[in-house]
C-alpha cells in the first residue's frame, strides 16, 4: 500500500484544473445547435442529454436560446479540484453513496459501506471494512482486516504537511462514533470502544475506551469473540 506525501497532495490540488461538471437535459430544435467536441452530446432532433463543463454548456444555451425550449441542469460540485476515484477496476465491495476521492488506495476484498467518505491520500488495507457514515480524512491509513465502525472519524492531515497522519494497524476494531485525532497510531489488534475520543497512541492488543480514551484492559478471548472479523462479509463473486 502506498501513502501519498502531504506535499504531493498539495501540489496535485494546486495544479489540478478546477472543474464544475454538469449534466443537462435539453429540449428544443436541436438540429440547429452545434455542440463542440469538448461537450458530450447525446441528442436527437428534439431532445437529449449533455455532459461537460458548465461554462461551456452555459455558452451553448445562451447562444442558442432561440432554438432551446427548456433545459434542466444537474450539478453537484463547483470548482472541484479532486475527481472521484474510478471504482470499476477495484476488487472490493463498495456500496451506493460512498464518496471516495481520487488517489485513494483500496485493498482487495475491502468493504466500503453506504455514505462513507474517504478523502485523498487515504489507504485502506485488504479485507478492511469502513462502515456507514465513517470518515477517513486525508492520508488516514487503515491496515488489513480492520473494522472502522459507523460514524467513526479518522482525522485527516494535509496541512500542515509536516503533521503525522492517523495510522490504524492490522486487525484493529474501531467502534461506532469513535474520533481518532491527528497523529495517533492505533496498534495492531487493538479495540477502540464506541464513542471514544482517541488523543494518544493505542498500544497493540489493548482495549481503550472513554473521552479521552484510556487503556481499560488487554485483549482476552472474550473480547476476541465479541469483535471477530467475519471474512464472509468480504467475499466477492468469482471472476469470470
Swiss-Prot record:
**Where does the signal peptide begin and end?**
none
**Pathway it belongs to?**
Amino-acid biosynthesis; L-lysine biosynthesis via DAP pathway; LL-2,6-diaminopimelate from (S)-tetrahydrodipicolinate (acetylase route): step 1/3
State the source organism's domain of life.
Bacteria
Q: What is its EC number?
A: 2.3.1.89
Q: Has UniProt tagged this entry with the keyword Transferase?
A: yes
Question: What catalytic activity is recorded?
Answer: (S)-2,3,4,5-tetrahydrodipicolinate + acetyl-CoA + H2O = L-2-acetamido-6-oxoheptanedioate + CoA
Q: A GO biological process this protein is involved in?
A: diaminopimelate biosynthetic process
Q: Does the keyword Transmembrane helix apply?
A: no
One MF term in GO for this entry?
Answer: tetrahydrodipicolinate N-acetyltransferase activity
Keyword set for this entry? Acyltransferase, Amino-acid biosynthesis, Diaminopimelate biosynthesis, Lysine biosynthesis, Repeat, Transferase
Q: Which PROSITE patterns match?
A: HEXAPEP_TRANSFERASES (PS00101)
Query: What's this chain's function?
Result: Catalyzes the transfer of an acetyl group from acetyl-CoA to tetrahydrodipicolinate.
Family stated for the protein in its record: Belongs to the transferase hexapeptide repeat family. DapH subfamily.
This chain belongs to which protein, by name? 2,3,4,5-tetrahydropyridine-2,6-dicarboxylate N-acetyltransferase
Q: Which organism is it from?
A: Bacillus anthracis
- This protein's gene is called dapH
Amino acid at each position: 500500500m502506498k501513502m501519498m506525501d502531504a506535499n504531493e497532495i498539495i501540489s496535485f490540488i494546486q495544479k489540478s484544473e478546477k472543474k464544475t461538471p454538469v449534466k443537462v437535459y435539453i429540449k428544443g430544435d436541436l438540429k440547429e445547435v452545434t455542440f463542440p467536441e469538448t461537450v458530450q452530446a447525446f441528442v436527437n432532433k428534439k431532445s437529449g442529454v449533455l455532459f461537460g463543463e458548465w461554462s461551456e454548456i452555459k455558452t451553448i444555451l445562451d447562444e442558442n436560446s432561440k432554438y432551446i425550449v427548456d433545459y434542466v441542469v444537474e450539478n453537484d460540485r463547483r470548482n472541484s479540484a479532486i475527481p472521484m476515484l474510478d471504482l470499476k477496476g477495484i476488487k472490493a465491495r463498495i456500496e451506493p453513496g460512498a464518496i471516495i476521492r481520487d488517489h485513494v488506495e483500496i485493498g482487495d476484498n475491502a468493504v466500503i459501506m453506504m455514505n462513507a467518505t474517504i478523502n485523498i491520500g487515504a489507504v485502506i488495507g485488504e479485507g478492511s471494512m469502513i462502515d456507514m457514515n465513517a470518515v477517513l480524512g486525508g492520508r488516514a491509513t487503515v491496515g488489513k482486516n480492520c473494522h472502522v465502525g459507523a460514524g467513526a472519524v479518522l482525522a485527516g492531515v494535509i496541512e500542515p504537511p509536516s503533521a503525522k497522519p492517523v495510522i490504524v494497524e492490522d486487525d484493529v476494531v474501531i467502534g461506532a462514533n469513535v474520533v481518532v485525532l491527528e497523529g495517533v497510531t492505533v496498534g495492531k489488534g487493538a479495540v477502540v470502544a464506541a464513542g471514544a475520543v482517541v488523543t494518544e497512541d493505542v498500544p497493540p492488543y489493548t482495549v481503550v475506551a472513554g473521552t479521552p480514551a484510556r487503556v481499560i484492559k488487554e485483549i482476552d478471548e472474550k473480547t476476541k469473540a465479541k469483535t471477530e472479523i467475519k471474512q464472509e462479509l468480504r467475499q466477492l463473486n468469482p471472476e469470470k
